[in-house]
Amino acid sequence: MNGDGFDDILIGARDADPNGIYNAGESYVVFGKAGGFSSSIDLSSLDGSNGFVLNGIDEFDISGFSVSSAGDVNGDGFDDILIGASTADPNGNREAGESYVVFGKAGGFSSIIDLSSLDGSNGFILNGIDRYDDSGYSVSSAGDVNGDGFDDVIIGARFADPAGESYKGITP
């Protein structure tokens, strides 16, 4: 994510309570490095130079339910990440779900990033469509599916109703 040539670790903690927000969820990025790691890493020690925390937004969103590398979605040469929050309520649609793409960059990460701060320059939010779709239940990099030179993502919505058929699931 930070372009240092070492793979990073992405961890989801869907039941975390960031800022006292019950089950908003958190995710953690631990930066890879030369020379290895100690036998355990205290995630509360992430300070921006060794990794960072991504805070979920609202109560019961369970952000971090699913996490994945996203490839390089914006084509800037840095790997991006993908975080699912399958029970988020975008636009008042109960449990339609949300997913977040967070852009990688060369250094300068703060120790905590609130997913509500994604503004297009640092990442973006993908809102589920309909009530109870559970969009973001599964997330994954897809590679460059359409051949435009940018990596694409797959977002699973396990209870979506494609073509009006209940609970058939859909991946937009």
What are these regions (language model features)?
Residues M1-P172:
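Conserved beta-strand/short-helix segments
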